Structure formats: structure tokens, C-alpha cells
A protein has these predicted regions:
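HhH-family (HhH-GPD) DNA N-glycosylase catalytic core used in base-excision repair
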Residues: 16-203
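Single conserved hydrophobic/aromatic residue that forms the stacking wall/gate
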Residues: 1-17
Length: 203
């Protein structure tokens, strides 16, 4: 919480929250009985990240979430990291049929062949975008003008619609507007903590 608040010049917010993490209200989606979920909510979700390795990891995980809960994916996150070589982009781009078969037989991750194949083809497109734009965050900024949007209670917006349409045009799969909106929330491009949450910021 401290790093998040200070990174955005919100020292006053940190002072209000300091010492109260154990008691503060959290977003309604956060399962308070799951320590991983609470830590993710408090220290990661909604904090702006611009590095390609993190953005790639989150895009893959969000694509696997389709039809499932984020909590399910988060619980398997370390398994995904192990299975996907810590989401090393070049390594994932080089995955062959043998590696696909290995992933499809790995019961510790989501064994959906379509999603697994999509994650690899999407990785190659992701790498192409990085080469074309300089970074994936620079690509996102083409649609957001580098702004951070503060909004709650939505599942799509104009940004997610446009980014989703462009990624699909480039050949990516499992990147519908709802998934992309969730991705943008996760990486801090859209800040969506509930109004009742202790980390809510009104802009």
C-alpha cells in the first residue's frame, strides 16, 4: 500500500491506511479467507506496471480466466509461472508441439488446449507489437494517451473495445473486451477499487 500511494503522490492516503490493513474494507470481489487474494488485492491489483514481462504474464493469465474465476487462476499462478518458464517471452514464443503436449498434460494449470495454443500464438503477436511500438505499454498508450482512468462497476469501456478489436485484428485470441478491461484494471491502466474499499481513490 505504501509503495502504491507514494508512487502516485498520495502520501495522505497512505497515512490514513497505515496500520489499518488488517481492518480496512476491501473490494467486494476479494475473498478475505484467501491470503493470496488479499495480498494480490492490497499490493498488486490496480498498481500501474509498464514492464513487458509483467504485462505479458497478466495478459496470458487473464486469457486463461475466460469462463473461470480470477481466484482460480491466482491460486494456480505459481504453477503457471513454472510451466511457462517464468513467462519468458522468447521462450514461450519458441514453444513447439512437444511443449504444448506437456502443458496439456500438466494438471497443476488450466489444461485447455485452445487457451494453451492461443497463449503461444498470442506471445508471438505480443513480441511483434513490442518490436513495432517499443514496448507493450507504449502500444496501450496509443489508445489511452498515457492516462489512468478511475472508474468502478464496469466490465468494458471504449478503451477495452478498441484494444480488443485491434488485438483480434492482429490475430490474438481470448482477448475480448471484457478480458482486456480486466487486464487493464489488473495492470493499473484503469483504477477500479470499489467505493467502499480502503484503497478507493476519487478523481
Amino acid at each position: 500500500i505504501r509503495d502504491f500511494c507514494l508512487s502516485r503522490g498520495l502520501g495522505d492516503v497512505y497515512k490514513r491506511q497505515r496500520g489499518y490493513e488488517a481492518y480496512m474494507n476491501r473490494c467486494k470481489w476479494c475473498d478475505l479467507k484467501n491470503p493470496k487474494y488479499v495480498e494480490y488485492h492490497d499490493k498488486e491489483w490496480g498498481i500501474l506496471r509498464t514492464d513487458d514481462s509483467y504485462l505479458f504474464e497478466m495478459l496470458v493469465l487473464e486469457s486463461f480466466q475466460a469462463g473461470l474465476s480470477w481466484e482460480c487462476i491466482l491460486n494456480k499462478r505459481e504453477n503457471f509461472r513454472r510451466a511457462y518458464d517464468e513467462f519468458d517471452l522468447d521462450k514461450v514464443c519458441g514453444y513447439d508441439e512437444e511443449k504444448i503436449a506437456e502443458l496439456c498434460s500438466d494438471s497443476s494449470i488450466v489444461r485447455n488446449k485452445l487457451k494453451i495454443r492461443a497463449s503461444i500464438s498470442n506471445a508471438r503477436i505480443f513480441r511483434d507489437i513490442v518490436k513495432e511500438q517499443g514496448s507493450f505499454y507504449d502500444y496501450l498508450c496509443k489508445f489511452t494517451d498515457g492516462e489512468i482512468l478511475y472508474e468502478c462497476d464496469k466490465t468494458t469501456n471504449e478503451w477495452s473495445d478498441r484494444i480488443s478489436a485491434d488485438l483480434k485484428k492482429r490475430g490474438m485470441k481470448f482477448v475480448g473486451s471484457v478480458i482486456i478491461y480486466s487486464f487493464l484494471q489488473a495492470v493499473g491502466v484503469i483504477y477500479s477499487h470499489d467505493r467502499e474499499c480502503g484503497l478507493y481513490i476519487e478523481k
